[in-house]
From Swiss-Prot:
Belongs to the protein-tyrosine phosphatase family. Non-receptor class dual specificity subfamily. InterPro entries: Dual-sp_phosphatase_cat-dom, Prot-tyrosine_phosphatase-like, Tyr_Pase_AS, Tyr_Pase_cat, Tyr_Pase_dom, TYR_PHOSPHATASE_DUAL_dom. It comes from the Viruses. SUPFAM superfamilies: (Phosphotyrosine protein) phosphatases II. Homodimer. This is Dual specificity protein phosphatase OPG106. Gene3D superfamilies: Protein tyrosine phosphatase superfamily. GO terms for molecular function: phosphoprotein phosphatase activity. Its main location: virion. GO terms for biological process: negative regulation of MAPK cascade; symbiont-mediated suppression of host innate immune response; symbiont-mediated suppression of host JAK-STAT cascade via inhibition of STAT1 activity; symbiont-mediated suppression of host type I interferon-mediated signaling pathway.
Length: 171
């Protein structure tokens, strides 16, 4: 087995078939200004203690937040095994990086706060990695977020796309 195939096998194997984690209900602070949440967290964003400048909506449904100055960015994504989310990684990670640099809080969410939003958060954290071992960093971030939130990027296709871009292509 070649190195790339081995890495992909080990990463997918170590993050699959784990105990069934329950869906997270609370918003998680990922970096100083980037938060991960679900649809309910987004609806509650205007009254949150965090003064969000942006909400990144990754659900299929477009909405507004009445009486709010929060800017909503909508990227409609389907949570299935055929959706190519990797084509959004560069734009989303660049946007989240700017939010962090400018101290502009942003909430990234999908319906449950698990797959679509989790994948974008994982991609963002992987894009910031300057370590020499992207495979170990992937496992560290994945398991740390899973410990914090419960379910996190359970969609095997989304995991595979992140692994291919940020782990396999880096080796």
């Amino acid at each position: 087995m070649d190195k790339k195939s081995l890495y992909k096998y080990l990463l997918l194997r170590s993050t699959g078939d784990m105990h069934r984690a329950k869906s997270p209900t609370i918003m998680t602070r990922v970096t100083n200004n980037v938060y991960l949440g679900n649809y309910k967290n987004a609806m509650d964003a205007p009254s949150s203690e965090v003064k969000f400048k942006y909400v990144l909506n990754l659900t299929m449904d477009k909405y507004t937040l009445p009486n709010s100055n929060i800017n909503i960015i909508h990227i409609p994504l389907v949570d299935d095994t055929t959706t190519d989310i990797s084509k959004y990684f560069d734009d989303v990670t660049a946007f989240l990086s700017k939010c962090d640099q400018r101290n502009e809080p942003v909430l990234v969410h999908c319906v449950a706060g698990v797959n679509r939003s989790g994948a974008m958060i994982l991609a963002y954290l992987m894009s910031k990695n300057k370590e020499s071992s992207p495979m170990l960093y992937f496992l560290y971030v994945y398991h740390s977020m899973r410990d914090l939130r419960g379910a996190f990027v359970e969609n095997p296709s989304f995991k595979r796309q992140i692994i291919e871009k940020y782990v396999i292509d880096k080796n």
